């Protein structure tokens, strides 16, 4: 059975690139346009095995989303990848603002997404 990845990003084009890339590689993909929608999906689904989330989104940003995910008993230990620009990533790392399992920098490169995801969650 394919493993399921939740992709949370307000950019429809970024979700499309990541979603298509992962589907071609054999993953199930569920998409959300912001952190609140992502939480709503998680509350109704117990089978998501990896979360990829953007940092900057309306309604609920990526940092708040991650904090809320870590409060959910079923998802406390679920791996999370953060989508950022290189500038955002370096600021977050310097400030110890977030703990993630991996970083995916924008602009999104499909080969990089596959490398990161298959390392964390082999198909």
Task: Name every feature range the model reports, one short phrase each.
Residues 57:
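Receiver (REC) domain active-site loop signature in two-component systems and cognate sites
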Residues 31-50:
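Acidic, metal-coordinating helix/loop segments flanking the phosphotransfer/catalytic sites
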Residues 16-24:
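Charged docking surfaces used in two-component/phosphorelay signaling
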Residues 108-117:
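C-terminal output helix
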Residues 47-49, 74-79:
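His-Asp phosphorelay/catalytic-motif detector in bacterial-type signaling
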Residues 54, 84:
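Active-site residues of response regulator receiver
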């Amino acid at each position: 059975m394919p493993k399921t990845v939740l992709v949370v990003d307000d950019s429809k084009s970024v979700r499309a690139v990541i979603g298509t890339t992962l589907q071609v590689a054999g993953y199930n993909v569920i998409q959300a346009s912001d952190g609140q929608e992502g939480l709503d999906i998680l509350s109704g689904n117990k089978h998501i095995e990896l979360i990829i989330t953007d940092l900057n989104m309306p309604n609920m940003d990526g940092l708040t989303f991650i904090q809320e995910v870590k409060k959910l008993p079923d998802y406390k230990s679920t791996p999370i990848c953060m989508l950022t620009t290189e500038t955002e990533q370096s600021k977050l790392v310097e400030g110890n603002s977030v703990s993630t399992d991996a970083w995916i920098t924008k602009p999104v490169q499909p080969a990089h997404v596959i490398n990161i995801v298959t390392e964390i969650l082999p198909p």
